[in-house]
């Protein structure tokens, strides 16, 4: 296959060059390449970017209620949105299960994937078998795992120290959900006792300080241990970003992720008639938090924009319509992210380098994919997204998530996704809303 005449996003610039693809790989990049009996895609006037990577999704998750999206529908939505690789966070397994239990289950789910995929391990408890379990995950091709500071299997400071020591020895990334559980439970319990159960109290029960305290503690523990691969997921607040900026200015090494929703949506959504659909954790915040996140993107303190895609139907979300504590937490977003972020390049709010770093380069580098994915270079997988500059609006009726709605419905974008190429195969023709069902996702060892 030869992609001709496209405007190609290369590291920090856009060049009009051709891309030759053979046997799933990019084999040549240059101006006016000879055709050599190749299948030709003339992409004049269109932009070509590397396939985006979403390192934070939750498909097939069971939180007492099953998510709307299984692995097939979730990865299909990802692919239609120009995300060609996901790294999924499995849910918790039964109490006492080993570290491989949920990964093995998800390996089976992955066989239905439309795009390429990998997994993070999920660490629930720590015991004499944990180190061997982490080593087993690494042998399966997983170089990362997640721990939580809240929810059922929250970790103590002592356990965090031990996890960081193990991860340092094994050269693994630890992704952490950073919220102080004691503070949340105190606030939420008081609100529920007082009958303050409107949706806005979900946000009030998880203020920015809840996140900032946990973030500061994690950074300090990692620094004490000499661990430099802490990955802070879905950072949402100015308070947390202030702690992060101070630590980064001191030379401390760790990674920071935010999500599309925290860059665009604020907590005024919790006063709207459909407020329940915006319930997620951390919650949506205020405009000053949004401004802080964008400022820290520009300063380089934020490494990744992911989605934390965790979708539930409105039927399930409405179980919490009169009591926020009964609402399943999570929103869809895996299809919307890449289009929204690329639009910021056309709107000149992001440079080419900033966009590529946030959605492709840094996710690939941090999680061990960069030898194959994350940029348009000879020798890498031919994962490519073709954009057409065009003023448009996101329409939830056209999206592939089984949630049936989008928190970005009606959102203005400056492009549409024309085609998606997965490992050299034309997987999506968005102009025809068509997917090549013969193309299957592959597990990518890291």
For each predicted feature, which ranges?
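Histidine-rich, glycine-flanked metal-binding segment
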Residues: 1-51
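Divalent metal-coordination and catalytic microenvironments
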Residues: 6, 19, 24, 45, ...
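Metal-associated gating/positioning segment near the N- to mid-region
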Residues: 44-112, 129
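Histidine/acidic residue-rich metal-binding segments in metalloenzymes
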Residues: 129-305
């Amino acid at each position: 296959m030869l992609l001709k005449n496209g405007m190609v996003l290369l590291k920090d610039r856009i060049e009009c060059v051709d891309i030759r693809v053979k046997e799933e790989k990019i084999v040549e990049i240059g101006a006016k390449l000879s055709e050599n009996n190749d299948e030709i895609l003339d992409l004049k006037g269109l932009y070509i970017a590397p396939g985006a990577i979403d390192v934070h999704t939750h498909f097939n998750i069971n939180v007492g209620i099953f998510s709307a999206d299984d692995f097939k529908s979730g990865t299909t939505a990802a692919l239609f949105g120009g995300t060609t690789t996901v790294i999924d966070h499995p849910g918790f397994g039964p109490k006492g299960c080993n570290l491989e239990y949920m990964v093995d289950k998800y390996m089976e789910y992955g066989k239905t994937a439309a795009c390429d995929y990998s997994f993070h391990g999920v660490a629930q408890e720590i015991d004499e078998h944990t180190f061997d379990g982490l080593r087993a995950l690494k042998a399966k091709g997983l170089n990362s795992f997640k721990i939580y500071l809240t929810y059922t299997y929250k970790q103590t400071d002592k356990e965090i120290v031990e996890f960081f020591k193990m991860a340092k020895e094994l050269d693994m990334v630890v992704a952490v959900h950073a919220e102080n559980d004691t503070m949340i439970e105190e606030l939420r319990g008081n609100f529920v006792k007082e009958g303050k159960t409107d949706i806005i109290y979900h946000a009030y029960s998880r203020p920015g300080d809840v996140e900032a305290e946990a973030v500061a503690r994690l950074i300090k523990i990692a620094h004490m241990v000499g661990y430099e691969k802490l990955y802070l997921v879905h950072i949402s607040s100015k308070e947390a970003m202030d702690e992060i900026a101070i630590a980064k200015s001191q030379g401390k090494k760790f990674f920071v992720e935010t999500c599309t929703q925290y860059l665009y949506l604020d907590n005024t959504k919790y006063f709207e008639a459909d407020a329940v659909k915006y319930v997620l954790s951390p919650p949506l915040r205020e405009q000053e938090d949004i401004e802080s996140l964008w400022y820290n993107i520009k300063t380089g303190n934020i490494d990744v924009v992911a989605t934390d895609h965790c979708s539930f139907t409105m039927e399930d979300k409405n179980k919490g319509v009169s009591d926020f504590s009964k609402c399943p937490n999570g929103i869809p977003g895996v299809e919307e992210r890449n289009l929204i972020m690329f639009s910021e390049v056309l709107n000149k709010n992001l440079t080419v380098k900033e966009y590529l770093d946030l959605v492709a380069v840094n996710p690939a580098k941090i999680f061990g994919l960069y030898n194959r994915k994350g940029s348009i270079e000879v020798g890498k997988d031919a994962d490519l997204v073709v954009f057409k500059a065009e003023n448009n609006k996101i329409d939830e009726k056209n999206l592939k998530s089984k949630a049936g709605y989008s928190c970005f419905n009606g959102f203005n974008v400056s492009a549409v996704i024309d085609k998606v190429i997965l490992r050299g195969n034309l997987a999506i023709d968005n102009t025809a809303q068509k997917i090549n069902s013969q193309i299957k996702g592959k597990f990518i060892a890291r």
